[in-house]
Regions:
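Exposed, low-structure sequence patches enriched in small/polar residues
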Residues: 1-157
Length: 157
């Protein structure tokens, strides 16, 4: 097991030569505490994150904050394959009555509730044939209940 604390600061200055309305500046910090637990057949990481960004879009100032939790895990099927799961839940707010935040703020997350679930399965059916599948779910201000599935069989020569 492992406990990790991370903190980073960022400054992003985007200048547009085409439209001045696209010029923006974002400064802030992101904090994350995570706990990792590795077993013989599985890996798990639980984390809590918190961030604050402030900046300017043309002449409008904003302050945004976000808090969330994340779980990432992987379960191994011996030498045959594994299944991975990533679950991310966050709540983000704009505190200065500005209607939106630039895409550089809060690590690209939208305002409001953000839910993202990603699963993937990799499995060797035989030594030379494998199956891969991923299932993804996203629900936020941009994508309302977006659900995708992708899979493939592979043959190795």
């Amino acid at each position: 097991s492992n406990l990790k604390l991370e903190r980073y600061h960022h400054i992003r200055d985007v200048e547009s030569n085409f439209l001045i309305e696209r010029s923006r500046k974002v400064k802030g910090s992101w904090n994350e505490i995570s706990f990792t637990l590795n077993e013989k057949r599985s890996e798990s990481e639980f984390s809590i994150k918190y961030g604050v960004d402030h900046g300017r879009v043309v002449s409008n100032s904003f302050i945004a904050q976000g808090i969330g939790i994340n779980y990432s895990g992987r379960l191994f099927f011996g030498e045959l394959g594994s299944v991975m799961l990533n679950f991310d839940l966050s709540e983000n707010k704009e505190l200065s009555n500005f209607q939106y935040i630039p895409p550089e703020a809060l690590n690209g997350q939208t305002l409001g509730k953000n839910i993202a679930v990603n699963t993937s399965l990799n499995y060797f059916i035989k030594k030379d044939i494998s199956f891969s599948m991923s299932v993804n779910y996203l629900d936020n201000l941009r994508y309302n209940n977006l659900f995708t599935i992708m899979g493939e069989f592979r043959a190795y020569l």
